[in-house]
A protein has these predicted regions:
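Hydrophobic mid-bilayer segments of alpha-helices in multi-pass membrane transport proteins
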Residues: 8-19, 26-48, 128-136, 167-174, ...
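Hydrophobic alpha-helical transmembrane segments of multi-pass integral membrane proteins
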Residues: 167-173, 196-229, 424-432, 453-489, ...
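Core transmembrane alpha-helical segments of multi-pass membrane transporters/permeases
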Residues: 74-77, 82-89, 133-187, 211, ...
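Intrinsically disordered, low-complexity non-transmembrane regions of multi-pass membrane transporters
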Residues: 1, 49-146, 303-335, 360-373, ...
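Long, contiguous bundles of hydrophobic transmembrane helices that form the permeation core
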Residues: 2-8, 57, 67-69, 281-411, ...
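Membrane-interfacial loop-to-helix junctions in multi-pass transporters
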Residues: 5-9, 160-167, 193-207, 236-244, ...
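Membrane-core helix-loop-helix motifs of multi-pass transport proteins
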Residues: 231-345, 520-557
Length: 564
């Protein structure tokens, strides 16, 4: 078994490669993450990887006595009297994994737990229950084969597993986002929000519009879209420009880190085994509560501060006037504009609700109507199917609105997939890096935390993600790295609360310390006309406040409503 010092050193090398590669050598995040995954896998002994794989497949030991033990086999009919299991442990001196005993199934107790007879293997170092785990012979064979793969195959396996979970979703989200922008649907949503709340309450419309648009559209793109509208509002009202900027940021940035199918929260949910529908609901509630705190902060701040509307390189004030005066007839209807955003949310969350309602209910007690509804959501509530339907609707809307030919449509889709492809590469590379971190046995670093409070576990996840964000800038990369550190720990212990809270703590941690190493910092500053000092002075404290408040909400919810 690797010592804690050795594990820390290997993990530290990986983190240094990611942070140093991105900041020091200006490597693309994809290259930095893949390189880090390769180096960490090279430094991790095969025996450590094998032990990690065995740990994922171990059978819970409920009790043990001299010569016997009781196992939790979940009363599976596949287990028969006479079936053999293995007791394995890592030898302290060498780190190698050895089989120290066999366990033969001899019967079941009154609670249908398996009783096994223990027979030590001659010549082994002996059974030590606090260091040994029980596995099937097949699991031992599979773990050995997995650990003996080449480094290239190990990294590619982590990369491919991540692509399987989220690759299609990100590509479809990119298509939806591009169609919303090119068709004018995104602008229509913002104008509709403004018409509901009125120009006096324009900041609120910016919050909710930014939040809604940032689920299928990446934050930088949402800011590009909405800041001209914010500038146009400043031309109309003659005041509150700083408030407009900050409200555009707060809605978009919280959805960016908390609500799938945005890549960061989508990846975190997949790694922690959180249902996407649950993540959408929980992320939406926490994200909007954080945005409201950011709004209160901005209202107070803007009583004492404002900034002038300045010319910016990408758009003159005359062009702003043209945007402000654009006719509504040039834009799609509001229901068509909202459909690609709302439909997948309804389908995915509907599937989650049905699964929760019918969980544990015997089939004979479910009415035919409920069975039909359940089958509908099983098919159309699948995250990939729901997003594919939404992408189809978005494409149809773009074609109808622009009346473009197939070549123009192909160009739009090509641009969307090019953008989404880069995100898929970065996220999948992050998945490979995360898997390599987990295989070092990093969960052992948190051994003393297993019995710690809910608050302590969530704070650790938040702090780890925050420090990575501070070091390298990207919220998405910090979430990928943070969940890579925490996922194996979360899988190995009883958290005492639903893992969605761990995902939320990681997402909130990615909101801390916005500064000059983040591309979003420069997008906000340059597009709005703010100086670097103004961005640091006004925007950075707000995003950090929202992240910290999100952690507080998550801690309170996990303690009061653990959902387990």
């Amino acid at each position: 078994m690797l010592s804690l010092t050795a594990t820390l050193c290997i993990v530290g090398v990986g983190l240094v490669i990611v942070v140093g590669g991105i900041l020091g050598f200006r490597l693309h995040a994809f290259l930095a993450l893949v390189l880090a995954a390769i180096v960490v896998s090279l430094l991790t002994p095969n025996s450590t990887v094998e032990w990690y794989q065995l740990g994922k497949q171990q059978i819970p030991v409920l009790s043990q006595q001299e010569g016997t033990a009781t196992l939790d086999l979940k009363s599976s009919p596949s287990h028969q009297i006479g079936q053999q299991f293995l007791l394995a442990k890592q030898v302290d001196a060498t780190g190698n994994v050895e089989t120290v005993a066999t366990a033969t199934l001899s019967g079941f107790d009154d609670n249908e737990h398996a009783i096994v007879d223990i027979m030590p293997v001659e010549g082994s170092t002996g059974v030590e229950w606090d260091k040994s785990i029980v596995v099937t012979p097949q699991a031992r064979e599979d773990a050995t084969a997995f650990a003996n793969q080449t480094v290239g195959n190990l990294v590619a396996g982590g990369f491919g597993a991540t692509c399987t979970g989220i690759g299609i979703l990100i590509a479809l989200a990119a298509i939806i986002g591009k169609c919303l922008l090119d068709s004018g649907a995104a602008e229509k949503i913002v104008r509709w929000m403004l018409s509901i709340v009125g120009e006096k309450n324009a900041p609120l419309s910016f919050i909710f519009s930014g939040f809604a648009l940032s689920t299928p559209v990446f934050f930088d793109t949402v800011f590009y879209l909405m800041i001209p509208i914010g500038k146009a509002m400043r031309l109309r009202t003659g005041k509150n420009y700083l408030l407009y900027i900050m409200t555009i940021v707060m809605g978009g940035t919280m959805a960016h880190s908390l609500v799938p199918p945005t890549p960061g929260p989508l990846f975190v949910a997949e790694e922690l085994g959180v249902d996407v529908g649950v993540m959408i609901l929980a992320g939406g509630l926490v994200g909007l509560s954080c945005a409201m705190v950011g709004f209160l902060y901005s209202i107070i701040l803007c009583r004492f501060a404002d900034i002038p509307l300045r010319e910016s390189p990408e758009m003159s004030l005359d062009e702003l006037q043209q945007i402000a005066n654009r006719e509504d007839s040039e834009l799609p209807s509001i229901w068509m504009s909202l459909m690609p955003i709302i439909l997948p949310v309804l389908l995915i969350t509907g599937a989650t609700v049905m699964n929760t309602m019918l969980k544990g209910v015997p089939q004979a007690e479910i009415s035919p109507v409920m069975k039909a509804v359940d089958q509908f959501f099983v098919l159309f509530g699948n995250k990939n199917i729901a997003m594919a339907i939404s992408a189809t609707l978005a494409i149809i809307m773009l074609v109808r609105q622009k009346k473009s030919d197939l070549s123009d449509l192909a160009n739009s889709l090509q641009a969307a997939l090019a953008s989404g492809g880069v995100i898929i590469l970065i996220t999948a590379a992050g998945g490979a890096f995360g898997k390599s971190l987990q295989q070092t046995g990093i969960a052992n670093l948190f051994g003393d935390v297993a019995g710690a409070s809910t608050t302590m576990i969530l704070v650790i996840a938040f702090v780890v993600t925050s420090l990575v964000r501070l070091a390298q800038g990207s919220a998405t990369v910090s979430m990928i790295t943070g969940v890579g550190v925490m996922a194996s720990f979360a899988a190995g212990v009883d958290l005492g609360f639903h893992p969605v809270y761990l995902a939320l703590a990681i997402g909130c941690g990615s909101k801390m310390f916005l500064w000059m190493n983040d591309s979003g910092f420069w997008v906000i500053g340059k597009m709005s006309g703010m100086t670097e000092w103004e961005t640091l002075k006004y925007v950075t404290p707000m995003t950090s406040l929202m992240g910290a408040f999100g952690l507080l909400v998550t801690i309170v919810a996990a303690n009061l409503l653990p959902l387990v």
